[in-house]
Structures are given as structure tokens and as C-alpha cells.
Amino acid sequence: MAELTTLARPYAKAAFEHAQAHQQLASWSAMLGLAAAVSQDDTMQRVLKAPRLTSAEKASTFIEVCGDKFDAQAQNFIHVAAENDRLLLLPEISALFDLYKAEQEKSVDVDVTSAFALNQEQQDKLAKVLSARLGREVRLHAAEDASLIGGVVIRAGDLVIDGSIRGKLANLAEALKS
């Protein structure tokens, strides 16, 4: 995974810098999201891994499948990625681009998993508290997992706050073993 990220980083950075310079962050994010989804399709994976096809043929096929969703710069990006055999890295490139975009916009995606469904008021309060703590606009994504027993697990980037009963029981069990 770290190797894929290392290979994808220069492409994501170049795409981000281009999109930022041309004030097209949203459209490039959408384009890279589409490209990532297309590259993960089983049929497209076989095309991209086909040794008989040239990089130009792979890029052309890829662009043809995406239709008119790509402008000239995006098509050029796909050709450059194909020439360097990096089309299979499009999911990582897209994810990194979105991280750069979130950093630029001072926002962060936060995944909150709770034992029970959070109502809108609870989600709003949690988003406000997290926004103050992280110093960023928070985009909250709520999910349920009954195995937590109670409490919540919050994930924002590499920050994880485990306030679940399951987590506390696991910590207690570990302490008792020591």
C-alpha cells in the first residue's frame, strides 16, 4: 500500500496543482473519481493489464469508455499515466488528490461508527465539537455497528478515538493480562 501511494503521489500532486491553478478542483476530483471507478472494473483491469496493447491503445480505450466526461487536460493526464503504466494507480491517485483538496479547503472527512443510530442533532453536535478540536470543517459520515455495544469510534485521517464499550473492554482485558 505504501509503495502504491509513493508511486501515485507525483501524479496526484501534478493533477492537484493543475486543478488548483485553473480553479477546477471540483471537476478534477469528479473526473479522478470516475477514472478510479472505471480502472477498478474487471473488464477494464484486463485491458489495462494486457501486454499486447500499447500505452496509447490503453489510454484511448480508457478515454472512450469514459465518454465526454474528460476535458483535453484530463485526457492528456490519462495518456501520461498510461505511458508510465500507472492507470491501475488511479484509485490511489484519486484518493491522494481528494486529501490535497481537503487540506486546501481546510476540511476533513470524519467517519463516526456508533452502536446505535445518531439523530441529526447528535451528529451536528459531534461535528461542531470535532470541528473545534481539529480546526477544520468536518464532513461527518455516520454508520452503525451493534458490536460496539455502546459509545462511538471516530476516525479522521490517521486520528482514531475509540470511545466504544467494546474498545474499553478490550483495554481492560489487556490490562488484566499484564
Curated annotation (Swiss-Prot):
Describe the family membership recorded for this protein in Swiss-Prot or TrEMBL. Belongs to the ATPase delta chain family.
Q: Please give the Pfam families that the UniProt record associates with this protein.
A: OSCP
| UniProt keyword terms in alphabetical order | ATP synthesis, Cell inner membrane, Cell membrane, CF(1), Hydrogen ion transport, Ion transport, Membrane, Transport
Q: Which organism is it from?
A: Pseudomonas fluorescens (strain ATCC BAA-477 / NRRL B-23932 / Pf-5)
Name the SUPFAM superfamilies for this protein.
N-terminal domain of the delta subunit of the F1F0-ATP synthase (SSF47928)
Q: What does this protein do?
A: F(1)F(0) ATP synthase produces ATP from ADP in the presence of a proton or sodium gradient. F-type ATPases consist of two structural domains, F(1) containing the extramembraneous catalytic core and F(0) containing the membrane proton channel, linked together by a central stalk and a peripheral stalk. During catalysis, ATP synthesis in the catalytic domain of F(1) is coupled via a rotary mechanism of the central stalk subunits to proton translocation.
Q: What is this protein called?
A: ATP synthase subunit delta
The record's disulfide annotation reads none
**Subunit annotation:** F-type ATPases have 2 components, F(1) - the catalytic core - and F(0) - the membrane proton channel. F(1) has five subunits: alpha(3), beta(3), gamma(1), delta(1), epsilon(1). F(0) has three main subunits: a(1), b(2) and c(10-14). The alpha and beta chains form an alternating ring which encloses part of the gamma chain. F(1) is attached to F(0) by a central stalk formed by the gamma and epsilon chains, while a peripheral stalk is formed by the delta and b chains.
Task: Give the domain of life.
Answer: Bacteria
Instruction: Give one GO molecular function term.
Output: proton-transporting ATP synthase activity, rotational mechanism
Any keyword Transport?
yes
Which InterPro entries does this entry report, sorted A to Z? ATP_synth_OSCP/delta_N_sf (IPR026015), ATPase_OSCP/dsu (IPR000711)
User: Which gene specifies this protein's sequence?
Assistant: atpH
Which cell locations does it reside in?
A: Cell inner membrane
Q: How does it sit in the membrane?
A: Peripheral membrane protein
A single GO cellular-component term from the record reads: proton-transporting ATP synthase complex
